[in-house]
Amino acid sequence: MLFPFALMKIAFVAPLPNSGTNRYYYRDIWQGMRAFQAEAAEFNIEILDFGFSGPLSSLPKHLEEVYQNHCDEISGLITLAVEDPAFTYFIDQFSKRSIPSVFIVSDLPQAKRLCCVRAQDLMAGSLAAELISGFTGNRGKALVVSGDIMVSTHYMNATGFEQYFAKSRSRMEVIKIYNRKEPERLYIELLELLRSDPEISAIYSCTATNTPPVCKAVQDAGRAGTVKVIGSDLFQESREMLLAGVLQAIIYKKPFQLGYLGCKALFNFLVKNEFPKSDSIFIEPIVLLKSNLPFYECDIAADNAYESI
């Protein structure tokens, strides 16, 4: 006779996908989480939605709220990592209560987590640099537009990009720009740079969030096609820009897999008592060009995908 599984609750703390620019990336992560939740329904798993709006710097505050109000009812935690003492403190507090944490998207190895599921960000940056090297013949200046320097996935992308050119001893000048989800400010800054500096020959947007304002600035500066642009992740706007020739390629980090595999790793540990094979589970990025885009277009989520899951 089969006995029903006791209800097990997992806290999922991540930026909401239905507010502003978060929809470009986090929507797929939430879809991955919902897909795994549906698959694991027979095991009586409930994933508690603690989505939040606002900057990632507010994440420790949301973890504090979960810890204070829900610590007695949850068996595990899935969240992102930020380099903030308050974040590390609350992850340690969860660990002391025997609540394992799985990180997705970004890592902080010194924190007490079970594992991290993330894109191979150094590889993503290196792939973008190699593409730009080929597109430009290593001539001119390359801008690498990243996100929040407190988030490992952002600065590791930029690092991988820089390291490629350093190892190849290229004369190409690399200029880093960090933008904390302020697309209009980024657009204005890039537009001024593109209009004033004819030596800019390439741009790599490390994040999905920054890809649309990068494309708009290149278009409005009248330099689409001449400035080679590599975008990040696949969504309706990036697809259109690739087909229009504003983007020459997309580095696709498969965010759906981050949400899905993060839940699976924690589920296997809690339900099956299986430890992850590694404390770092990497998703290998894919280079999308016009020629292979049709094979991945089915991955593009509808605008109402989060609400319909």
Spans of model-derived segments:
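Short beta-strand elements in bilobed, periplasmic/extracellular small-molecule ligand-binding domains
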Residues: 33, 37-59, 142-144, 162-184
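Hydrophobic alpha-helical segments within soluble ligand-binding/sensing domains
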Residues: 117-142, 156, 186-187, 234, ...
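Alpha-helical recognition/docking segments in bacterial nutrient-uptake
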Residues: 5-123, 127
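Hinge/cleft segment of the Venus flytrap/periplasmic-binding protein
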Residues: 8, 149, 165, 254-309
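Hydrophobic alpha-helical
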Residues: 66-70, 75-99, 161, 175-239
